[in-house]
Regions:
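C-terminal and inter-domain tail/linker signature
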Residues: 1-125
Length: 125
């Protein structure tokens, strides 16, 4: 698969709550997720966080997907069942190495997510 297809499949797997399939698209060594208020260096930690968000996830809408070689950029709408927050727009940059995602950099309004989690963010360690 091309990098763009790998990322599209990853997003589809997260939306459908197929976390084992999504995790299989991530490298095991050298993985990194960086967001404005959290960081994961282990795919298991990212998947545990995603699993924890299932209760509020209404939909994950892929609005745009662009790629240049192994770099893939996605615009997503994270729709929630948590009415005080509503939807969160995300810009996500993926670096693909071979047939796996090596790095995920997410950009979004961190204050919204922090409020949604009641100020309890996962540890960055």
């Amino acid at each position: 698969m091309k990098p763009k297809d790998i990322v599209a499949q990853f997003v589809a797997d997260i939306q459908a709550q197929r976390f084992d399939e999504a995790k299989a698209l991530l490298v095991t060594d050298g993985f990194e997720y960086v967001g404005p208020n959290m960081r994961f260096v282990n795919p298991d930690d990212l998947m545990a966080y995603q699993f924890g968000m299932v209760a509020i996830q209404k939909a994950l809408i892929l609005r745009q997907l662009s790629a240049e070689e192994e770099q893939v950029f996605a615009i997503l709408d994270y729709r929630t069942n948590f009415e005080p927050i509503g939807d969160v727009r995300l810009a996500v940059w993926f670096s693909v190495l071979g047939d796996k995602i090596q790095k995920v950099e997410a950009f979004y309004n961190a204050a919204v997510v922090e409020n949604m989690l009641g100020g309890n963010l996962p540890s960055a360690s």
